[in-house]
C-alpha cells in the first residue's frame, strides 16, 4: 500500500488557539496551563458520553456545525499532541515530555536513570524521591488533554457529527486510563462533564475502567454506523478527519473510513481487560474476547500514534537524553538486553551506544576507556551534580543513537502491544483468534521503535531478529559499574526468548511480558503497569527505595504516584472523596484497584 508523506515544519492550523500562562520554554518545570481564546464565553456542560449516531443532518447544517465548532476543533487537536508531550497546541516537545515521562515513570519502569540531581526548578535525590516540582508532571499533561477535548465533547453542536464526538471521547478515555494507572483515582466524572470549580468528587480506578469500557461499546456502535451514511456525509467527514486527527495513519496511506478507529477502540478495551485480570478475572476474560472478536489492530499501518516523520517534528527524547544529559540507560535495562542478546545491543550500528567518555572507578582507579561497552546506571543511585561529563562522570554512561530515535513514532497503540496482549490471553485459555506463539513471535518482529516507513531505520533489527527469536537460553551476564558505586550484580534474567510449548504458564508469561517491556520502550506508562501487575520483567532492586515517602523498602517497587495537587481545595477534595476512591492512604506503596497481591495464575 502506498504511503503518503506530509512533511511540515510548522503546525499549520495548529490545534489550539491559546496563550501561555507563566510558561518558560527553557524550564523543565512548565506549569502547562492553557488560557483558551474565548469566542463563545458559555461553559457548556452537556452529555459527553451520549452519542446518537442515528441523528440526521443536511449538508448545509453540517457546514454550519463546522463553522460553529472551528475553534473547538482546533483546540481539541492540541489535546492529541498533549497525550505524548505536547503543550499550547504544539507538537510533542522536550519540556512537557520530560515532565510527563522522564522525571518519573521512565525511572519507575527502569528504562532510564536520571544522572544528575540538580534541575533549574527542582531536585531529584534518587528515583523514588518525591519531588513536589516533578510529581505533578503526568497530571499536568493530562489536564491539557482534558482542557483541550472536554469543551468540544460538551458542546451541543458536536452531537450533529457523532463520529467526531466518538473519536474524541475515545482519545480522552485513553488519556484518562493512563492517568488512572498513575494515581489510582481522580475526578473523572467531573472532568468529563466540564465541571469548572471545586469541590471535585474523586472516583476510583474500578469505576473509571468500567465506565470507559461502556463508552467503548457506544463508540464502536457509532463508528460501525458510518457505512450507512450518505456519500456526501462520508466525504465531508473524511476531510474533517484528515484535517483534525493526526493520531490515525489513514491520511498518510490515502485511506478513508473509520475501520481503523474501531480496531483502536477494541485494542484499548483489550489492554484494559488485561490490566484488571487479577481484580476481575471473569470480566477481564469477557472483555478481552469481546475486543478480539470485534477486531483489534492487526498490522503496523493500523497503529495509532504521533508520527514525527510525517508531521515534521523530532522525538523529544533526543533533546532530553543527548543534548541536555538528563537521562541515561538504566542498569536493569542494560542487563536485560545484554542477557537476551537483543538486537538493540548487537550489530555494527546498535541502538544503544557504548560509554561516551572515560569512566574512572572511584575505588580502584580502573579506567573504562571511551566507547568500550554499553553501561547503565543503577536505578535509585544518588545522581551526580551538573550536566557536564567533565565534572559528572555519570554523563558518560550509555545513551541511544539519536539518528534512530529522531523519527521514532510516539505510539498510542502499537501492534506489538496488541500481539503480546493476545499472547497473554491465549496462555490463559481465552479465545484470542490464534495461538500464543503466533502473537508472541509477531510481537517481537514488530517490536522495534524505529520509523516503519524508512527501511534503513529497521534494517539492523530485521537482520538480527530471526536469530534472536530462536535464542533458547539467556546469556550469562554480570552488571559491573565502572564508577564502583555499587557492587557487581549478576543478571536476574534467566529465561531465553524462544517459545517453548513445554514451559509452564508462569514462564510463558514472563517471556511475554519481558518482550512486551522491550517493545514498549520508551512508553513507560504501560511498562510500569505490567511490572506492577505481573512482577515482570525481572529487574534489579531499586536502591534507596526508602527515600520516597517512607512506605517502600529495598526490594519494593513504587505502586503509584501520590496525588499531584497540593492546593487547599484539592487537599480538601482528597480528604473528602479521594482516599476512599483510592482505597487506601496517599502513599507510594498503596496498590491501585487492579494491582492485587495475588499469584498470576
Where are the regions a protein language model picked out?
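Membrane-proximal, proline-rich intrinsically disordered regions
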Residues: 22-106, 543-601
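C-terminal functional modules
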Residues: 448, 457, 461-601
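Charged, glycine/proline-rich intrinsically disordered loops and linkers
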Residues: 37-55, 231-245, 366-385, 456-494
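Structured, solvent-exposed acidic/aromatic patches
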Residues: 111-455, 501-510, 515
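Extracellular glycan-recognition regions
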Residues: 23-28, 135, 536-537
Amino acid at each position: 500500500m502506498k504511503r503518503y508523506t506530509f512533511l511540515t515544519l510548522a503546525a499549520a492550523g495548529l490545534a489550539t488557539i491559546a496563550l501561555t500562562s507563566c510558561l518558560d520554554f527553557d524550564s523543565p518545570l512548565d506549569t502547562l496551563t492553557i488560557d483558551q481564546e474565548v469566542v463563545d464565553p458559555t461553559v457548556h456542560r452537556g452529555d459527553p458520553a451520549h452519542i446518537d449516531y442515528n441523528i440526521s443532518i443536511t449538508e448545509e447544517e453540517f457546514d454550519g456545525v463546522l463553522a460553529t465548532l472551528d475553534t473547538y476543533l482546533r483546540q481539541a487537536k492540541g489535546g492529541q499532541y498533549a497525550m505524548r508531550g505536547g503543550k499550547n497546541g504544539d507538537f510533542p516537545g522536550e519540556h512537557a515530555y520530560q515532565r510527563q515521562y522522564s522525571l518519573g515513570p521512565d525511572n519507575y519502569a527502569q528504562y532510564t536513570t536520571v544522572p544528575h540531581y540538580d534541575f533549574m526548578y527542582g531536585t531529584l535525590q534518587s528515583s523514588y524521591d518525591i519531588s513536589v516540582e516533578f510529581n505533578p508532571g503526568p497530571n499536568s499533561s493530562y489536564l491539557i488533554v482534558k482542557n483541550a477535548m472536554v469543551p468540544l465533547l460538551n458542546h451541543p453542536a458536536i452531537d450533529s457529527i457523532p463520529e467526531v464526538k466518538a473519536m474524541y471521547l475515545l482519545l480522552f478515555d485513553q488519556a484518562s486510563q493512563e492517568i488512572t494507572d498513575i494515581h489510582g483515582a481522580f475526578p473523572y466524572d467531573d472532568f468529563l462533564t466540564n465541571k469548572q470549580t471545586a469541590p471535585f468528587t474523586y472516583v476510583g480506578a474500578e469505576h473509571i475502567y468500567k465506565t470507559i469500557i461502556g463508552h467503548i461499546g457506544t463508540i464502536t456502535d457509532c463508528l460501525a454506523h458510518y457505512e450507512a451514511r450518505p456519500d456526501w456525509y462520508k466525504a465531508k467527514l473524511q476531510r474533517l478527519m484528515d484535517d483534525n486527527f493526526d493520531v490515525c495513519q489513514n491520511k498518510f496511506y490515502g485511506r478513508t473510513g473509520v475501520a481503523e478507529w474501531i480496531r483502536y477502540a477494541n485494542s484499548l478495551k483489550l489492554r484494559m481487560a488485561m490490566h484488571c485480570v487479577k481484580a476481575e478475572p471473569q470480566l477481564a476474560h469477557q472483555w478481552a474476547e469481546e475486543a478480539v472478536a470485534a477486531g483489534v489492530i492487526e498490522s503496523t499501518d493500523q497503529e495509532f500514534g504521533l508520527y514525527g516523520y510525517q508531521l515534521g517534528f523530532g522525538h523529544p527524547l533526543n533533546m532530553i537524553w543527548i543534548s541536555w544529559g538528563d537521562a541515561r540507560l538504566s542498569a536493569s535495562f542494560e542487563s536485560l538486553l545484554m542477557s537476551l542478546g537483543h538486537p538493540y545491543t548487537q550489530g555494527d550500528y546498535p541502538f544503544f551506544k557504548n560509554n561516551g567518555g572515560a569512566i574512572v572507578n572511584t575505588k580502584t582507579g580502573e579506567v573504562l576507556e571511551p566507547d568500550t561497552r554499553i553501561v547503565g546506571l543503577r536505578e535509585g543511585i544518588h545522581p551526580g551534580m551538573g550536566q557536564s561529563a567533565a565534572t559528572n562522570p555519570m554523563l558518560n554512561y550509555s545513551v541511544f543513537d539519536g539518528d534512530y530515535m529522531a523519527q521514532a513514532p510516539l505510539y498510542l497503540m502499537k501492534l506489538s502491544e496488541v500481539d503480546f496482549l493476545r499472547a497473554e490471553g491465549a496462555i490463559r485459555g481465552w479465545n484470542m483468534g490464534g495461538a500464543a506463539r503466533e502473537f508472541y513471535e509477531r510481537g517481537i518482529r514488530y517490536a522495534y521503535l524505529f520509523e516503519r516507513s524508512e527501511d534503513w531505520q529497521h534494517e539492523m533489527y530485521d537482520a538480527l531478529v530471526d536469530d534472536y527469536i530462536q535464542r533458547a537460553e539467556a546469556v550469562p551476564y554480570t552488571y559491573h559499574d565502572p564508577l564502583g558505586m555499587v557492587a557487581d550484580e549478576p543478571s536476574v534474567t534467566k529465561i531465553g526468548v524462544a517459545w517453548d510449548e513445554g514451559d509452564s504458564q508462569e514462564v510463558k508469561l514472563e517471556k511475554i511480558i519481558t518482550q512486551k517491556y522491550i517493545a514498549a520502550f520508551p512508553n513507560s506508562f504501560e511498562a510500569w503497569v505490567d511490572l506492577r501487575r505481573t512482577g515482570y520483567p525481572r529487574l534489579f532492586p531499586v536502591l534507596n527505595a526508602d527515600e520516597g515517602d517512607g512506605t517502600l523498602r529495598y526490594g519494593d517497587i513504587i505502586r503509584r504516584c501520590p496525588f499531584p495537587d497540593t492546593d487547599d481545595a484539592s487537599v480538601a477534595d482528597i480528604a473528602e472523596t479521594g482516599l476512599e476512591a483510592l482505597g487506601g492512604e496517599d502513599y507510594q506503596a498503596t496498590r491501585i484497584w487492579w494491582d492485587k497481591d495475588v499469584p498470576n495464575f
